[in-house]
């Protein structure tokens, strides 16, 4: 999956129920940039509802990323540690994709 490929169903970031941030991501690269700038309360809200996993599995079709993000939820990470680890997972996958391309 090309990390720059735009998808039809963007991910919309919220800080809580019925509290949209007005930030969306239509590609994995946009998702990474949004993860770097939204508040940690938004990251926690989406991680523990399973929103990230669902979007990555259903829209981006990435079993690898799905399993790695599921592990973050199971580990119970929060706050800036969550951001750091989520960014690491995304950058690792993007780096792998770019490295393996001919």
Please give the residue ranges for each predicted region.
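Terminal, compositionally biased segments used for targeting/anchoring and flexible tails
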Residues: 1-102
């Amino acid at each position: 999956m090309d990390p720059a490929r735009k998808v039809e169903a963007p991910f919309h970031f919220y800080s809580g129920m019925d509290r949209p941030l007005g930030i969306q991501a239509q590609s994995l690269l946009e998702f990474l940039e949004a993860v770097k700038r939204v508040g940690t309360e938004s990251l926690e809200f989406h991680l523990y509802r399973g929103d990230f996993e669902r979007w990555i599995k259903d829209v981006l079709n990435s079993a690898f990323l799905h399993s790695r993000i599921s592990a973050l939820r199971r580990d119970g990470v929060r706050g800036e540690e969550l951001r750091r680890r989520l960014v690491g997972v995304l950058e690792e996958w993007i780096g792998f994709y770019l490295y393996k391309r001919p």
